[in-house]
C-alpha cells in the first residue's frame, strides 16, 4: 500500500481514535510479513497523540501475517477483558491483503476465536481489492463483530461507522 491509499488508511485509523473517549484505552498493532509489538494499551486522554503519531509514521512493507496478528491481538485483549469486564474489548482489524505469512491457518484462527470464553469482539475491514472479504467476513462473524469493505474514497467513513459500536 502506497500513496493515497496509505494516506487515507492512516487518516481513517486516526479518525477512529478521535471518535473514542478520553477514558477509553487503545493499542495499535502493525503487521506485514510479521507481527510487531503492540503500542499500548494506553488511555486515550494522555496517549491519543502518541498513537496518532505512530500511525502517521507507519510504512507499508510486503507480506501479510493477518491470522497471527489477529490471534496475538485477540489473546492480549481477552486477557485484559478478564481483568476488567467493565469495558468494551474489541479488535478493529484493517488489511489490504490476503494472509500469506502466518504460521497458523484460517481454521486454526477461527477455532481459537470460537473456543475462547471471551467478551472480545472482532471487527474487520477489507481495504481495497486485494483483501479477501469472504475470509474477513467469517472472522468478524465468529468474533461476534462486523465486517466492512473500504476504499481510499470511503475508509475514513468506514472507521467512523466502526467507532459508533463503541
Question: Language-model segments: which ranges?
Answer:
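Exposed acidic/Ser/Thr-rich ligand/metal-binding surfaces
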Residues: 1-25, 30-123, 129-166
Amino acid at each position: 500500500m502506497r500513496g493515497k491509499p496509505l494516506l487515507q488508511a492512516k487518516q481513517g485509523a486516526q479518525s477512529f481514535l478521535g471518535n473514542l473517549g478520553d477514558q477509553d484505552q487503545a493499542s495499535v498493532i502493525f503487521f506485514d510479513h510479521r507481527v510487531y509489538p503492540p503500542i499500548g494499551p494506553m488511555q486515550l486522554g494522555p496517549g491519543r497523540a502518541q498513537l496518532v503519531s505512530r500511525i502517521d509514521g507507519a510504512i507499508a512493507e510486503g507480506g501479510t501475517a493477518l491470522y497471527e496478528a489477529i490471534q496475538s491481538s485477540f489473546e492480549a485483549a481477552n486477557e485484559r477483558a478478564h481483568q476488567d469486564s467493565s469495558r468494551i474489548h474489541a479488535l478493529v482489524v484493517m488489511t489490504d491483503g490476503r494472509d500469506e505469512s502466518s504460521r497458523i491457518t484460517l481454521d486454526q484462527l477461527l477455532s481459537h476465536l470460537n473456543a475462547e470464553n471471551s467478551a472480545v469482539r472482532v471487527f474487520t475491514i477489507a481495504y481495497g481489492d486485494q483483501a479477501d472479504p469472504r475470509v474477513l467476513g467469517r472472522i468478524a462473524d465468529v468474533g461476534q463483530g462486523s465486517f466492512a469493505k473500504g476504499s481510499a474514497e470511503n475508509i475514513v467513513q468506514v472507521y467512523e461507522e466502526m467507532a459508533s459500536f463503541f
